[in-house]
């Protein structure tokens, strides 16, 4: 495969091994052409130098995505690369444009999600990781761009995954060419996809190698129109394995449909008279009845569902399953010898039962069915002869009938599917997907294997020609000189098989036409004809077998059944029987045979199949082919097992190794200039000159190495076979010499370093010793000086201490004397002050005691009166409460009671305040009168004392003065009378004071009772409020539920108008409790028919005027949108919110929808985003569902009660008047909204979300192109020849990152200029950064060349720029930076050094805590260090990740390593409401254009 190379000792090579195919090892000894190799397994082998191949030690551990990039393109290199990728679940690998798919035998749903299809859409082949989607996309793009039909050929042996790969291709083509929007009925692509389950049910079966093996070939033509949309399709099938219906080997199964029908629901099983599949002969020949991974009952329902999709009616489905059931019953008919010679009849009652059941299911005559199985009619010229069949012949007849019925049924299904799908006669382009059997070689190979291998021979020839063509195109593209490349042509094998006359098929047809021919005579004919043919041999000791040397190996065929299987005819009795069936479906399967066809020449399966192959190849030759080779890694059908020998054989059978051999025949090694110089620049470093370009440098290097025959292309170096190994050998020798030099230098450096350290150590020890001696002398001197200083300081301390004690004692004595004098003086002053205070407090106490008595009496009187009035009102309220009727009246009266009780409480509080004031005034009067009485009492008392003293004096003087004049006696009497009067007045005052005290006590008691009653009334008021609130909540819930039920039908169409609403609405009632003078004038007009029409027309004109004004950009006022504010004021004034029918909302919605038709104008969209969000905020604050806020929105009822009248006086107080004035100035008014208003609010919310999404998507679209340029660092070659390019490379990426920041700044400026709410700006940036995170992260995981150290540093520098921008606009960016967490952690992992020392816990908990195991595994396996050539994480870490992935393999979500872009709306209406305030709109001015219009006077 490659030329012999000259290995050196230490070279790494591959040696052949009978068990493992190839083993890697190291050359340890060379003796001429004998090479001793130490294998990695530990054993030593001696081989010839011609039997070893070089190994690329620098190949990445995870393999390469395209094997043409391998340094050595040979069998062991290819095998090792596939195994390395298979071990890390990378099951797809390119070989040029050929995709190799290794069956993982496990579910990998993350590889086939819709998100993955989106990733591959439009990506160039090789740009992303290998995938069937990439092949399908390349075919689709080539068809659309070049106008050339395409074909995708999927091949491989049974169990390799051909069917699944075909499904993926068809799914992706349906994704690319689908119609998108739903159409009536099923689309073409849906029918094409759903045809797979139907064909699998009737054409797939379990074989030894595969549980779901396709036993037929399939070519699906998907037709496209000029725009690239699927317009039609056709399915062509080849060579159904009919013999499987009657003969099943253990442990295989028959076709799936038989087992599905047996597992059908009980009613279907009874209808078809079916039971356990083990009782049917056609099924119980094998012990395998049930498959572990397949539920036949579920598959039955899935198949019926697929039949519905592809257009098979329920009647046709019933007929199909009746035919299938009849075949099972036919198989259980056994025959015994009849009464006549060589005749037969059904053996027993069981056979008769199955015969009868089969006849019933086929709707034919039971006797006719028996005759068709047991008899033959021979027609001669004169008469018709009936011939009986013996039991053995009857069994063969039975099996022939079963096989032909199933074959016709399968053909009908294919034809029905094609008819249902429909072909486009005008289609010019198609993409064909070929799913056909791979090369087969078993112990027993019959006619089916012969036809299958013929197919593979034809396809292999087509494949070789395509590969050769690709090689030529590659050479032409690189403009190199090339000569004709020889490759193995299998035309001689094809001539051997299909040449006419003289080919094997022609001889087989000839043998079939002779009645007496047997397989032995046919074999002898083959032996005679091809005894000298190099591709044909006769096995030893074989009488009827023959061997053909195919391209993939020798295959021995057994001819026993060749003749029977090649005959393509239907027994006449079977044809007549089924054509006469009363079931139209069965009769149509066997239409009457025309006379022309009866007289036509012999037709065979082989010839017909050969014609089908010719037709297929004609189609393929008119298309551009693409190849997918499916590989089965092991025969155990288990994951994680890679059998080298098995895979190698399949690579050979699939033609992959032949393609590699063709590549090796020319220039097998192709390296880009930079890769070549980076790898081999060490051979001739002097050629890496600053002034040299890459091609010249490569040429100089190759000339320096003395190689010849190479070619320098436009972008690559093309090397002959073996030249890469020679270069690697020289490189290894140079590296070895360099290693020796490095080792010598290192040893010299280490010895020198040791000597220097010893010398430094000796010097340091000497310095330490000298220092120690010097420090000892210095320490003695310090101690002597210190002793002298201590003595001096001690003497000074003792003297100072004696003086300080004497000084302190003197001061202490003086302080004690002065303190004693001061304390005596302080004590005297305290006594004087205390006496004064006691006198003052005593006088105050006496005065206060008298005042409290008077105040208590006054309060008692007031409380008694208030209690009387309150009880009277409470009694009236109770009577009114007992008279309540309906729920609404109860609610209104409760509201009235609550208000009255509220006002009563307020009045009570006010009365308490007034009474307090009256108390104070009365107390003041009482105090003043009391003082007067006390003064009079004191004066009277003083007079009495004087009188008593005068009387005493008189009594003392009386004995002396005997004679008193008359005048003195009269004066005495007057004084006595006056004294008596004063005494009486004093006693009456004392009585009056006692009565007043009693009344005060009684009043206090009554006041306490009244207070209790007032508290009880207040508690009752609270309870009534609670009850009323509950009633309101119930009513509100009922109304809200009603509104929600009405609105559910329009939730998904917020932009459309409400059906059923007329364009105009009749104004029934314009009163809402807040009428202006202008409204009063309008409502006073008599509403008759003509006046109503005029008002409606005026309303429509006003709405038109409003829309004409606000549909233009009328700007902002104080940072708030004028249009939104104007619309809200107009709708509020026109009472549209309270109207049951209005067209204003529909007109506004239409206006907004037409205003945002230009989806690319971010400025215009931002303007309307601000307006719609502001208007939504105003509606959110204003609108209340009907009945939910009736109490708050209604005007307080006018009351004539005492408390109501008194409350009116309270409303006119200064504080309440100011509050009313502030409420009048409020912009937002609560309104009880009707259904149209609530619908308008929902539609407005939908438009806010829609405009937000449009702006966000525009930004994403702008950034998408830039992100793709920011993910991969520019490649920089080794040496100076790229220095100028490096300097440009540093600036070029920065331009793309700066362009992203410029795009963000541009949009931010637009949003700020249009005053978009801050919360929406933050959400836009948050979702945009999340999009950037998803795109960068997914690109990193899908492109191996991105998972490098240098690329990590490159992306990290770009992320730093974004972080700086987020810091600069932190207010508007919000938490956007946190959205980049995945790419930040992934890049952080790429740029850390010494990854092999990092443990799994360190990665999961410290480096990348947010990443899943699948994502970490993907990064670790793809990573390669392009700067320092260090290793990735250790194998233990990889094993830990793989174990965890195996545990989570059943979870589809956990298996996905890609991120999904979240396009949902990330905010709610409440967030918008919380970001604004009502006061922000207080200073907003309406549109100036409307202020001049007399109809909009209310805007002033």
Curated annotation (Swiss-Prot):
Compartmental location: Cytoplasm
Ranges for domain Dilute: 1146-1447
SUPFAM superfamilies per the UniProt record, alphabetical: P-loop containing nucleoside triphosphate hydrolases
Gene Ontology cellular component annotations, sorted alphabetically: cytoplasm; myosin complex
Domain Myosin motor: 62-732
Keyword Nucleotide-binding: yes
One of the GO biological process terms: actin filament organization
Signal sequence residues: none
UniProt feature coiled coil, ranges: 884-1049
Residue ranges occupied by any IQ domain in the UniProt entry: 735-764, 758-787, 783-812, 806-835, 831-860, 854-883
Residue ranges constituting the Myosin N-terminal SH3-like domain according to the UniProt record: 8-57
Protein residues bound to ATP: 156-163, 210-218
Chain positions covered by the region annotation Actin-binding: 496-530, 532-555, 590-613, 613-635
Keyword flag Iron-sulfur: no
Disruption phenotype: No visible phenotype.
GO terms assigned for molecular function: actin filament binding; ATP binding; calmodulin binding; cytoskeletal motor activity
Domain comment, as recorded: IQ domain mediates interaction with calmodulin.
Family of the protein in this entry: Belongs to the TRAFAC class myosin-kinesin ATPase superfamily. Myosin family. Plant myosin class XI subfamily.
Complex formation: Homodimer.
General function of this protein: Myosin heavy chain that is required for the cell cycle-regulated transport of various organelles and proteins for their segregation. Functions by binding with its tail domain to receptor proteins on organelles and exerting force with its N-terminal motor domain against actin filaments, thereby transporting its cargo along polarized actin cables.
Official protein name in the record: Myosin-8
Native organism: Arabidopsis thaliana (Mouse-ear cress)
Gene that encodes it: XI-B
